[in-house]
């Protein structure tokens, strides 16, 4: 999937404005999700329920229009949701799972695709009966499974928009936060504050916190000003990445040291960041970036050491 930067943003903004004004019909799906349900840990159960779940979720996510924005088919956001079923109760239709959620973003004028988001949800639990018709009401969240899928749909779309325009995903991300607020009565872990500092509540609450505005700005400065610029001028692109890390990433960690967002971000950016600086840039630049990344995520030091090479 390739997106031609300014033209893509122009279409997004035009479509968004037109939709607000009611001047044009807005029908376009935003996501191109690959959903996998791994049930290898479950023995003695007819696999058809898991196949049906996978097919139903894929259809639900990809065929639903989540926003009023228009995306061409080749501009849809690529994402992967890999669900591992650890327990399944056929009598109650309860699935106990964990899920790895990953979203990707094409880099302008390049065949390279970068990771926009990647994290493991260890509380991806829900009820599902085979052949169940999935329904979702944003204002009345009463189904755990569709709430989970909607949460990640809005999170991914919002972060993608943030990467093309400063705070560009504000409205969509607010809808993600609304799902969390409306899901408080669901009897499932992951929606409430203080349960975990990296659960669904923590991720979107921290991301939308005013004190984390530098982290949101990072999405634009790193991807649009940094990676997208590399195809035409590698030195300028890397310099912009350096500025984004030295200002946005560093400040967000200093302003909210208890937030895990910077650490999660550096987890899935580890290899990309080391490749950007390995054998490139001045020693001072390399050392500055190393110090920032090590202070945020010392567990990835093997990758950070490559930056200094």
Protein language model features and the residues they cover:
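Sec-dependent N-terminal signal peptides
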Residues: 12-21
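Sec/Tat signal peptide C-region and signal peptidase I cleavage site
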Residues: 23-28
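Start-of-domain marker
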Residues: 29-96, 107-109
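A cross-kingdom marker for long, charged
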Residues: 36, 223-309
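Acidic/His-rich structured neighborhood in mature extracellular/periplasmic domains
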Residues: 91-204
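Flexible, glycine-rich surface segments
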Residues: 165-258
